[in-house]
């Protein structure tokens, strides 16, 4: 069942024009509001970033008519490794449309756009930049995985920052480790942070780790252009 999509937008600090666009994608069963605290923490480190926090495309829960049910980007009902990729591919054009629209509205180019996703939202972010190489300059994916690892010859222009809990029992750290190896083999800039005592959660420490990696990546890219 589809739902009306709600999108929260927050501009940069008043004295800062929007130099970056950060799009936050929530976990399955949550909603856009669940990512707003993380969005504000990121803006504390990046005051010139415009924040966009959309809700998933479909409702999640047993009573889909209830206003209290959560949202999801693609259905998890009957989800398997065999059908996961097809379900994601079905919604990727809408993800691209959403991000392109926000880039136009905020006048921020793709190379200064960052997708920040948790769990299902992180998977959608990873698959989006795999499908559309020029969609965003970076991805920060928390407790997430590729539906299908990038294969030899895959073009990916985004910097990828993976943050994962060492004790994640929902999405095993093995997925993040495999993703990091595959990306490194494609010469894609990638970082992997395993927080050993963390389960499947988006904590303050994880947010700080991801935002720091993002800041370091932006600095390194700027430094490279000066040489």
Task: Name every feature range the model reports, one short phrase each.
Residues 116-121, 125:
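Gly/Ala-rich beta-loop-alpha elbow adjacent to hydrolase catalytic centers
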Residues 2-108:
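Serine-hydrolase catalytic machinery in alpha/beta-hydrolase-like enzymes
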Residues 134-146:
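A conserved short beta-strand
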Residues 115-117, 142, 163:
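Short beta-strand immediately N-terminal to the catalytic nucleophile in serine-hydrolase-like folds
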Residues 34, 169-175:
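Conserved alpha/beta-hydrolase "acid-adjacent" motif
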Residues 161-164, 168:
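Short beta-strand/loop motif that positions the catalytic acidic residue
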Residues 174-227:
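C-terminal catalytic histidine-bearing segment of alpha/beta-hydrolase fold enzymes
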Residues 107-117:
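Alpha/beta-hydrolase fold nucleophile elbow
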């Amino acid at each position: 069942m589809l739902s009306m999509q709600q999108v929260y937008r927050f501009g940069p600090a008043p004295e800062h024009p929007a130099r970056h666009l950060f799009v936050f994608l929530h976990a399955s069963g949550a909603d856009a509001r669940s990512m707003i605290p993380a969005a504000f923490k990121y803006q504390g480190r990046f005051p010139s970033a415009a924040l966009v926090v959309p809700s998933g495309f479909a409702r999640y829960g047993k009573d889909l008519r209830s206003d209290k049910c959560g949202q999801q980007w693609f259905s998890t009902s009957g989800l398997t490794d065999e059908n996961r990729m097809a379900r994601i591919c079905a919604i990727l054009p809408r993800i691209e449309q959403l991000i392109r629209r926000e880039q136009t509205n905020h006048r921020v180019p793709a190379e200064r756009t960052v997708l920040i996703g948790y769990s299902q939202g992180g998977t959608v972010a990873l698959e989006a930049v795999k499908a559309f190489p020029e969609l965003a300059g970076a991805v920060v994916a928390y407790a997430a995985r590729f539906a299908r690892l990038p294969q030899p010859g895959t073009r990916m222009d985004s910097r990828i920052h993976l943050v994962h809990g060492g004790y994640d029992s929902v999405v095993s750290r093995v997925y993040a480790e495999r993703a990091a190896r595959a990306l490194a083999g494609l010469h894609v800039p990638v970082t992997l942070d395993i927080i050993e005592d963390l389960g499947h959660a988006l904590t303050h420490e994880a947010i700080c780790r991801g935002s720091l990696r993002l800041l370091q990546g932006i600095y390194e890219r700027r430094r490279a252009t000066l040489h």
